């Protein structure tokens, strides 16, 4: 199971643009140099709550709606794959691994991004958050994916760049590989208990295959 933002793609420019647009839609004048890298990977509601706090504003729902409108119109196209990711996906697919996307991003946005980058064909399933909010957090999302696709936790692996990916995987009985080219730090991933870390996106496929030892899920 692969995370999206900070794992497969650098989505920061588009996410930042949509966050700024959401704050402006609520009447605020945000700093254009705002750095939100460390919040990426959190549920969107949590990100907006953090951003609105400095304005004494609690209109989280309105901010989320404004963000999603802007992101759906233009923000999602500001994503670029990390070096070597396409080759890693090709290599993993070639070995027969089943590959699933597991992102806190809205599933419809994730699908559009993968289609835009021509990554969709590598995936056996694309899952993300849904309008009802029931899959906003990683443990619930991963449990849903495992059940939906009849996957065994002990034969599967979660790959991500934030502590939410690691703790979410462990909560449902999966191992977790932390990637160091995304938005989380080595300390964050180690503290969360990542089973292994990988430094370079070019080494992703090799590390995944080594951890799985030929087992047929990802």
Feature-to-residue mapping (PLM):
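Acidic, Mg2+-coordinating phosphoryl-transfer loop and its flanking beta/alpha structural elements
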Residues: 157-198
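N-terminal helical cap/lid subdomain that shapes the substrate entry/recognition surface
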Residues: 1-87, 95, 108
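Short beta->alpha linker loops
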Residues: 39, 43, 80-84, 105, ...
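Non-catalytic pre-domain segments flanking phosphatase-related domains
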Residues: 1-2, 214-218
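Short acidic capping loops at alpha-helix termini that bridge into adjacent secondary structure
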Residues: 30-35, 58-59, 121-125, 153-157
């Amino acid at each position: 199971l692969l995370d999206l933002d900070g794992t497969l793609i650098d989505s920061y420019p588009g996410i930042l643009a949509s966050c700024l647009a959401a704050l402006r839609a609520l009447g605020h004048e945000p700093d254009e140099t705002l750095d939100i890298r460390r919040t990426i990977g959190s549920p969107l509601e949590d990100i907006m709550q953090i951003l609105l706090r400095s304005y004494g504003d609690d209109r989280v729902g309105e901010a989320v709606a404004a963000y999603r409108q802007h992101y759906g119109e233009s923000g999602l196209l500001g994503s670029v794959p990390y070096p070597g990711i396409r080759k890693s996906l090709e290599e993993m697919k070639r070995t027969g691994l089943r590959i699933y996307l597991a992102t806190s991003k809205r599933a419809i946005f994730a699908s559009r991004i993968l289609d835009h980058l021509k990554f969709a064909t590598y995936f056996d399933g694309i899952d993300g958050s849904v309008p009802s909010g029931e899959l906003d957090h990683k443990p619930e999302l991963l449990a849903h994916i495992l059940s939906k696709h009849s996957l065994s936790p002990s034969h599967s692996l979660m790959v991500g760049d934030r502590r939410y990916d690691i703790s979410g995987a462990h909560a449902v009985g999966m191992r977790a590989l932390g990637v160091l080219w995304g938005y989380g730090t080595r300390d964050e991933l180690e503290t969360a208990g990542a089973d292994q870390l990988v430094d370079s996106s070019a080494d992703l496929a090799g590390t995944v295959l080594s951890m799985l030892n030929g087992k047929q899920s990802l």
